[in-house]
């Protein structure tokens, strides 16, 4: 078995095309199983508070920390939740419903069976996959006030939305502090706040899933940019590559014809949740879903190399590839 694992600390390579002014402060640290970098312009002393908030959220939301609320829920079948965890769980279930289960926060047993939680990779047999499919059901999660409950065999994992929610929380903190310019890189989940100090949009490069270069550069202001791609974590067995984005309907890696999805919008949680869901849906269903909503734009990269950009990104995406199709709402 050959392991292929492209774990980029900055998934989108969210570099600054125009840097912060001299008063900027930056902090790099490890949390939520990734490297994070926070850059805040024009305001001193906030980085300690921001990092502490991230670490608190991690303690609540971790699926592996025996002290976390999610761990307690999975072990005991029921637990009381903090305000943060309750809010995120409620919002995550909303995205599960909105995407008709393309995002499912109960996928964790399948991730474990494939070895993506431990890096001990294996391909489950058909009987195992059939049994796993019976455990994937977000509708089995109940939330009654501060208490969450799940039946035996079901397990919750908020990993597909945790960094997006963290971006949302940090954005609120910065707004309360009056910060007008910042760039938050939460392991590739990028949140651009305001313009850069030179009065121009932040530049965020989108990774080319087929190589070391970039598909292009997004110029964004007050936007989140989140990518999900099968190239991020995968393994090869008997000549077949298996990636970590699982289809809840099959409990196996999604075979949707897509290899990367980038979602751009105001809300980091929305972008995080939908980057996974759209990948599972595939191009046609993803574009139909986009046409039904007004809160995001996206870039879809197919396994054959074709790139589709939704029309709302035409003016802010500078492509580095030749053939790009623009999807229209009409």
What are these regions (language model features)?
Residues 2-9, 14-330:
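Mature catalytic core of soluble alpha/beta enzymes
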């Amino acid at each position: 078995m050959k392991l292929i694992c492209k774990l980029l600390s900055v998934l989108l390579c969210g570099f600054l095309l125009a840097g912060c002014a001299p008063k900027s402060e930056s902090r790099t640290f490890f949390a939520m199983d990734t490297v994070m970098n926070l850059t805040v312009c024009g305001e001193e002393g906030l980085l300690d508070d921001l990092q502490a908030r991230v670490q608190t959220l991690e303690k609540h939301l971790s699926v592996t920390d025996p002290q976390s609320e999610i761990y307690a829920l999975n072990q005991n079948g029921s637990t009381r939740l903090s305000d943060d965890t309750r809010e995120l769980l409620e919002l995550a279930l909303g995205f599960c419903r909105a995407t008709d289960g393309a995002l499912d926060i109960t996928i964790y047993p399948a991730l474990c069976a494939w070895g993506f939680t431990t890096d001990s990779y294996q391909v489950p047999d058909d009987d195992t996959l059939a049994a796993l499919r019976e455990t994937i059901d977000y509708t089995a999660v109940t939330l009654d006030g501060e208490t969450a409950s799940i039946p035996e065999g079901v397990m919750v994992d908020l990993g597909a939305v945790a960094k997006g929610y963290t971006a949302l929380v940090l954005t609120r903190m910065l707004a309360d502090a009056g910060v007008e310019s910042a760039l938050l890189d939460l392991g590739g989940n990028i949140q651009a706040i305001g313009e850069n100090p030179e009065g121009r949009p932040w530049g965020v490069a989108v990774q080319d899933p087929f190589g070391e270069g970039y598909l292009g550069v997004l110029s964004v202001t007050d936007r989140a940019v989140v990518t999900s791609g099968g190239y991020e974590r995968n393994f090869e067995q008997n000549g077949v590559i298996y990636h970590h984005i699982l289809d809840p309907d099959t409990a196996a890696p999604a075979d949707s014809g897509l290899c990367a999805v980038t979602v751009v919008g105001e809300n980091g949680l929305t972008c995080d949740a939908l980057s996974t869901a759209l990948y599972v849906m595939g191009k046609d269903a993803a574009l139909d879903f986009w046409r039904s909503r007004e809160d995001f734009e996206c870039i879809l990269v197919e396994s054959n190399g074709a790139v589709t950009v939704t029309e709302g990104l035409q003016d802010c995406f500078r492509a580095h590839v030749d053939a790009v199709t623009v999807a229209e709402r009409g």
